[in-house]
């Protein structure tokens, strides 16, 4: 996956070095766009934090936020109970310094598209390699069958139809033809899958409803954990590969691979490029959440999920069991 330097990020946003200086204060106070969640004298419950329009960054919760810590996804809350989730492998917290919420969202869109294009290209290249190997294999076997020589056949210690006893040749040829037909059918399926990959077009993620779920302790009265659940979009491409193309290229192994193991293309063509299974993020550090400055920007939140806050922010906490709109076990 491509790594994005701060210069790359600024180019993607069309922001020059001089402009960044002017935005330096926006990074520190830009969270003011998100309302009270950015400046709080008391810890903010999750239901209040996510109910406001704002941008949150998901990262590895085992790491301390820092300029080189990678951001896995960016979550954009619309203030109406919905969240749009962007994949952004390669960006870091340092890349967000001085950016407003709007600019972070624009960056998220560019990064999400980049992830899509990278996965699409990887799927196309992998399938293309497999298709080329199998096509060459099929062409070679077809030429042998058309010539009546069946040179790749080696069931009796010698290659070709001449090595097969006369009384068993019909059965051997039938076996060869079955392998050839199966190869052609699977090759056709692979080409269809590749066409699916090539036709795939990027679409921006749309805001989807999220829910907050609270887990209680043995008494049922005290919060013991909380998580946010949401549909997390995935990119689905046709995936197929050949483990060892040399087996299909060699006349000594080509037919054996097809006849003994068969080539069954079990890879399925996805119904849609985009799927959205439910995902969740645990909201840890319930008593308090530390804040961390990166350059001129201060981040705070839960372990693994952070937003831009003002210096001195009191942090974020779990909801109580009577919080409105929160599912309780």
Label each region the model flagged.
Residues 24-27:
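C-terminal motif of bacterial Sec signal peptides marking the signal peptidase cleavage site
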């Amino acid at each position: 996956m491509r790594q994005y330097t701060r210069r790359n990020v600024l180019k993607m946003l069309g922001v020059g070095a001089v402009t960044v200086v002017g935005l330096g204060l926006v990074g520190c106070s830009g969270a003011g766009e998100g309302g009270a969640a950015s400046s709080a004298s008391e810890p903010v419950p999750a239901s209040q934090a996510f109910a406001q329009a704002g941008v949150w960054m998901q990262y590895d919760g085992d790491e301390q936020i820092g300029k080189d810590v990678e951001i896995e996804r960016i979550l954009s809350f619309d203030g109406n109970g919905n969240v749009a989730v962007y994949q952004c492998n390669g960006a870091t917290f340092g890349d967000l310094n001085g950016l407003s919420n709007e600019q972070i969202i624009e960056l998220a869109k560019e990064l999400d598209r980049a992830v899509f294009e990278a996965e699409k290209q990887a799927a196309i290249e992998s399938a293309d390699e497999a298709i080329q190997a199998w096509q060459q294999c099929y062409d070679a076997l077809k030429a042998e069958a058309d010539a009546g020589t069946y040179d790749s056949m080696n069931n009796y210690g010698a290659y070709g139809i001449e090595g097969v006893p006369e009384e068993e040749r019909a059965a051997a040829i039938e076996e060869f033809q079955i392998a050839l037909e199966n190869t052609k059918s699977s090759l056709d399926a692979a080409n269809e899958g590749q066409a699916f990959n090539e036709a795939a077009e990027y679409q921006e993620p749309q805001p989807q409803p999220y829910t907050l779920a609270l887990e209680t302790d043995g008494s049922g009265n005290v919060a013991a954990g909380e998580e946010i659940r949401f549909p997390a979009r995935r990119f689905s491409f046709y995936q197929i590969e050949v483990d060892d193309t040399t087996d299909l290229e060699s006349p000594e192994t080509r037919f054996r691979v097809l006849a003994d193991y068969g080539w069954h293309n079990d890879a399925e063509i996805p119904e849609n490029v985009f799927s959205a299974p439910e995902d969740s993020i645990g909201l840890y550090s319930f008593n308090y959440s530390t804040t961390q400055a990166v350059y001129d920007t201060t981040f705070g939140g839960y372990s693994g999920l952070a937003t831009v806050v003002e210096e001195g922010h009191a942090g974020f906490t779990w909801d109580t069991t009577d919080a409105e709109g929160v599912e309780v076990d």
